[in-house]
Regions:
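Carbohydrate-interacting/catalytic domains
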Residues: 1-137, 141-143, 149-153, 159-163, ...
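Hydrophobic faces of well-ordered beta-strands that scaffold small-molecule active sites
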Residues: 132-134, 204-206, 250-252, 340, ...
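Substrate-binding/active-site clefts of carbohydrate-active enzymes
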Residues: 137-202, 209-335, 356-362, 379
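Aromatic/acidic polysaccharide-binding cleft in carbohydrate-active enzymes
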Residues: 139, 383-384, 436-471, 487-526
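Short, solvent-exposed loop/turn segments at secondary-structure junctions
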Residues: 139-142, 210-212, 256-257, 333, ...
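Conserved residues at the C-terminal ends of beta-strands
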Residues: 207, 226, 343, 348, ...
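Active-site-proximal helices and loops of the catalytic beta/alpha 8
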Residues: 240-249, 257-258, 263-274, 328-330, ...
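Aromatic-anchored helix/helix-loop segment that forms the rim or "lid"
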Residues: 420, 424, 460-481
């Protein structure tokens, strides 16, 4: 909102503190209508979402500011976490008036209210909040030998050729069963820990590693057992220990909303010798699933019959996953993991997530719990329920899909103002601890490869074409230039930079399974990797990039710039996402200025820095 404005929640003249408020904290609101409007009264109109209560607080006259009259009030945030929606009401002595909401003055209709998040303060583990995450799809990262899948759950087979495409064509029944494996292993990951450390990695987030019939392993067969194609529990303990020696923690993927139909729990095909819920109503797991009636009709995740949905409220299931002394969450943390990422957090009840958080922190004092949420997690509605993910007792933070969406929109031709607005909305809505612990990324196992997205115009229409698609030299050159910009934003923006395996060496691919190819050992784009490693090193070195706040300096057209500062250190990021030269000027009251990426030095003139950025060029100034 540009000057002059009546109320802007991001302006300290109108609201302090910025953004979310801690339970019980005092929040100061000030409105500044033009005196010529004739308003003599102003009220703050609140609605507390979880309490279901409304409140109207009259603001007191607070003098004049030029041609504006000021109204102010100090509001004490509730003692319990809450989501508050608010707008203002103005009226004159003659009784006439109007409301003020995010769109401006209005005299009718439902106000489009501002949001105030009220949260209970909690601490994010420092190893995560100031680190860099590397996401691995375990089957596709590194294999040391070709394993034999004979005798394992599921009709699995292993590619002999590491460089082949994953299978994507449906079988004769029209199903893509994901039974083709490449043989990546935990020992393979261990063998590359030094290279990951050189990249700046401080945490490994691994897609599921427990026994499963599918290569993605999101249909768990046995939570107590490492999938034999990956290794065993001793390999896992060794991975965690050796990673920690290099300053790297391990984050596991918790898939607790559903299991696999081929699992020790459901056992639809009778592979396991014990009785599963699909075989007998006397199974110890029978109350984990909902049948309509037993055994052929049952609840499944999104109706996919190979993914029977779990009843999270089944007492024995809660004890097995969370509450028990040797629960799944606790036992794998004791085995060496440092945290969990909850798959499909929207599908899990809030009380379940709260219990999981408690178990994580009981098992490991600096344990981490993050969640897969694709939208703004502060006000998410899932299955008609407003969620409380970030209010202090559930998740430490979430995967920041809004960051990826907004950044890619900007890099692919959108206005920089949209990137800024999307990120400022998240900063305003999230508790600061959660905002600065956002898992920021350019791609995951659920998105197309970042280089492909940036280099190509549109995806080919047919899956056949997408399977064989490769960027042309011209497309790859443009995509690489934009990838460098995207990586610069990733490593310099508040949050935890997260790299999906292979993005740092120029892997390509559209949607699943083409985004889950094997790591191209010996064929890496080393120039891209060196650039990522440089950025990872700079983040480790510079306090401002790990802890600094953010202030936007420019966000217009194809140019974005922001500054982060901490303990007297400043880092300025400037991004030109356009295909032509851009100029940028800023105050720089210091003697010298260096682009920390290229080493190029700039000399301020009369305290002003005048920069020329070429097409698709970015700078990190310090």
């Amino acid at each position: 909102m540009s000057e002059p404005f009546v109320f802007d929640p991001r302006c300290e003249l109108c609201k302090t503190p910025f953004g979310a408020a801690v339970c019980g904290q005092e929040v100061l609101f000030t409105c500044r209508p033009l005196a010529s409007e004739g308003f003599t009264h102003c009220a703050l109109v609140l609605h507390r979402e979880f309490a279901g209560q409304g409140q109207e607080i009259e603001l007191s006259p607070a003098g004049f500011l030029g041609d504006r009259v000021c109204f102010s009030t100090a509001f004490s945030a509730p003692e319990e976490p809450e989501l508050i929606w608010y707008h203002f009401r103005f009226w004159r002595d003659d009784g006439s008036g109007c409301d003020l909401d995010r769109t401006g003055y209005r005299s009718d209709g439902q106000p489009l209210s501002w949001q105030l998040t009220v949260y209970r303060r909690s601490t994010v583990p420092e190893w995560y909040g100031e680190g860099m995450v590397y996401q691995i799809f375990p089957d596709r990262f590194r294999r040391l030998s070709v394993p034999d899948p004979k005798g394992l759950v599921g009709n699995r087979w292993v590619h002999q050729n590491w460089d082949e495409n994953p299978v994507w064509r449906p079988d004769p029944d029209g199903e893509v069963r994901n039974r083709d494996f490449f043989g990546g292993s935990l020992k393979g990951i261990i063998s590359k820990l030094d290279e990951l450390a050189e990249l700046g990695v401080t945490a490994l987030y691994m897609c599921p590693i427990f026994e499963s019939a599918s290569n993605h392993r999101y249909n768990t067969a046995d939570y107590t057992k490492i999938d034999p194609l990956l290794g065993d529990e001793e390999d896992f303990k060794s991975l965690c220990a050796r990673a920690k020696e290099r300053g790297i923690r391990v984050i596991l993927d918790g898939v607790f909303n559903h299991t696999g139909s081929q699992s020790i729990y459901f056992n639809a095909d009778g592979f396991y010798p014990s009785l599963g819920a699909a075989q007998s109503q006397d199974s110890p797991y029978s109350d984990w699933f909902s049948f309509h009636p037993w055994p052929d009709d049952y609840d499944a995740w999104w109706g996919i019959r190979t993914l029977p949905a779990v009843r999270e409220d089944a007492a024995s299931y809660v004890d097995y996953i969370i509450d028990g002394e040797n629960s799944i969450i606790r036992r794998w943390l004791r085995a060496g993991a440092s945290g969990w990422r909850l798959d499909v957090a929207d599908e899990l009840p809030g009380w379940f997530i709260e219990k999981a958080r408690k178990a994580v922190e009981e098992a490991k004092s600096d344990g981490l719990l993050i969640g897969e949420v694709w939208e703004d997690a502060s006000n998410k509605i899932a299955y008609s329920q407003r969620r409380k993910y970030l209010l202090g007792s559930e998740l430490h933070s979430v995967m920041n899909y809004p960051f990826r969406t907004a950044l890619l929109t900007f890099l692919k031709g959108g206005d920089a103002s949209g990137f800024r607005e999307a990120m400022e909305t998240i900063r305003e809505n999230y508790p600061p601890e959660a905002f600065y612990a956002n898992m920021n990324f350019l791609g995951t196992h659920d998105t197309a490869r970042i280089l492909t997205v940036l280099g190509a115009d549109e995806p080919p229409a047919s899956k056949e074409e997408r399977a064989s698609f490769r960027l042309s030299p011209v497309q790859r050159e443009r995509g690489t230039a934009l990838l460098r910009l995207a990586a610069l934003a990733l490593f310099s923006f508040p949050g935890v930079p997260t790299v999906y395996y292979g993005d740092e060496v120029g892997m390509e691919g559209w949607e699943d399974p083409f985004n889950r190819g094997t790591y191209p050992w010996g064929r890496e784009d080393t120039a891209i990797r060196d650039y990522f490693a440089l950025l990872g090193g700079l983040r480790k070195q510079r306090t401002s990039l790990r802890r600094g706040g953010i202030r936007w300096m420019e966000a217009q057209g194809r140019l974005a710039a922001y500054i982060r500062e901490s303990a007297g250190e400043r880092s300025v990021t400037v991004l030109n996402a356009g295909d032509s030269e851009q100029s940028f000027e800023m105050d720089w009251p210091w003697e010298t200025c260096t682009d920390l990426v290229s080493g190029q030095k700039f000399t301020p003139v009369d305290g002003r820095l005048i920069l020329k950025l070429g097409p698709y060029e970015g700078l990190l100034l310090g």
